[in-house]
Amino acid sequence: MMRIGGVSGWLRSAAITGAAGIPMSTHLYPEISAHVMRVTETAHWLEWQDWPDPILTEPFQLKEGKIIVPDKPGQGIEWNEKAVAKFAMK
């Protein structure tokens, strides 16, 4: 996401690759990537890590090898404030 220009850059690239029939995959940031892959015509693989799970109130769920994308506003995630506080720099 960060090297393609964020969500807007992804959508521009997805339009080009979709027209050419070229598959697109993501690298890192599954909490964002899951959403853009849902609207990518040639979505291929979503790279998955569970790294953010300890700091989310409701970690993403997988079913039959596929992510269940939250339908909540924004990114669909909510931070566990107590868990996040453990990692704060003081």
Positions of PLM-derived features:
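Shared catalytic-loop signature of beta/alpha-barrel
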Residues: 1-66
